[in-house]
């Protein structure tokens, strides 16, 4: 979101410098012109570092450690590298080719990637069936000089209200990654599809917006987004908010594609019939 733009002094009485767009233009030109090249370390330290997790933090750390001369191995439990960038952010917001070209650069700099490898408990039947290899922390400690934990946070915030167990109620991190996998050509055993359905997205943030856009692309009959907080102002009072990131109404491309937005709504009950969600009981907040 480029929060620094809100703190730009020009933003007090005019428009801030669009540094996000400027930096995008610079790096896009750099890749197009071939200015971005691998930078392998000139000298090796002889030290081995294991990076656990291949999301933004893991990839950034792996690159800097490799350039410092360390031998870096990145362990990723999923089938592809990228973490939230690859599986959480929809393709219509982030084309995965941007991730792939950075991974190619890291490989050229000496970084080794091990996918389908879970760092955790002892191997069991469930992980074996999924084709995932389990490596214990003790094994890594014996093989590496340092471990960097960059696993991220994948525990969803639940909504513990009656009816939560009904079929058809999904976490965003169940819904978004499976669609990204489908886009990549992965066969899904039980895909979650909004096609022809009336969809309610609970949560008014960026993740909710991503779910709105995904549901629209799947052919949802209708999409409604619920936000617990009251509707923010269309325009912030800069005398009060500057230099902080302002709270104001933000409309994404997903909203523009088709979405009804409701504010100050709290969901109290998931209603259902025969184990399937059929509606919600909500209250309007004051």
Walk through the language-model features, giving the residues of each.
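Iron-sulfur (Fe-S) cluster-binding segments and ferredoxin-like electron-carrier domains
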Residues: 2-29
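Cofactor-binding loop segments of dinucleotide-utilizing enzymes, especially the Rossmann-like FAD-
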Residues: 54, 77, 204, 228-231, ...
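Glycine-rich dinucleotide-binding loop and its adjacent helix/turn
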Residues: 26-43, 104-115, 156-218
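A Rossmann-like FAD-binding core segment of flavoenzymes
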Residues: 97-158, 180-189, 216-286
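Short, hinge-like loop/turn segments at secondary-structure boundaries
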Residues: 90-94, 165-167, 240-246
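N-terminal Rossmann-like FAD-binding beta1-loop-alpha1 element of flavoenzymes
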Residues: 48-73, 207-218
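Glycine-rich FAD pyrophosphate-binding loop
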Residues: 70-86, 223-233
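Ferredoxin-like iron-sulfur electron-transfer modules
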Residues: 1-2, 35-52, 57, 86-87, ...
């Amino acid at each position: 979101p480029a929060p620094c733009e809100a703190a730009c002094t020009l933003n007090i009485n005019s428009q801030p410098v669009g540094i996000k767009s400027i930096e995008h233009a610079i790096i896009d030109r750099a890749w197009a012109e071939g200015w971005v090249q691998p930078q392998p370390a000139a000298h090796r330290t002889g030290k081995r570092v294991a990076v656990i997790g291949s999301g933004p933090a893991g990839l950034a750390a792996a690159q800097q450690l490799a350039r410092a001369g360390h031998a870096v191995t990145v362990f990723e439990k999923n089938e592809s590298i990228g973490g939230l960038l690859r599986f959480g952010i929809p393709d219509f917001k982030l084309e995965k080719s941007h991730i792939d070209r950075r991974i190619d650069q890291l490989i050229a700099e000496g970084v080794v990637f091990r996918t389908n490898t879970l760092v955790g408990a002892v191997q069991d039947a469930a992980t074996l069936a999924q084709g995932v290899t389990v490596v214990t922390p003790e094994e890594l400690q014996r093989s590496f000089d340092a471990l960097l934990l960059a696993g991220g946070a994948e525990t969803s915030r639940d909504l513990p209200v009656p009816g939560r167990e009904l079929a058809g109620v999904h976490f965003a991190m169940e819904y978004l990654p499976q669609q990204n996998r489908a886009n990549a050509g992965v066969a899904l055993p039980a895909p979650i599809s909004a096609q022809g359905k009336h969809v309610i997205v609970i949560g008014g943030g960026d993740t909710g917006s991503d779910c709105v856009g995904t549901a629209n692309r799947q052919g949802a009959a209708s999409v409604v987004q619920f936000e617990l907080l009251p509707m923010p102002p269309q325009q912030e009072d800069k005398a009060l908010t500057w230099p902080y990131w302002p709270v104001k109404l933000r409309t994404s491309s997903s909203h523009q594609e088709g979405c009804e937005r409701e504010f100050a709504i709290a969901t109290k009950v998931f209603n259902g019939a025969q184990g399937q969600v059929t509606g919600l009981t909500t209250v309007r907040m004051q």
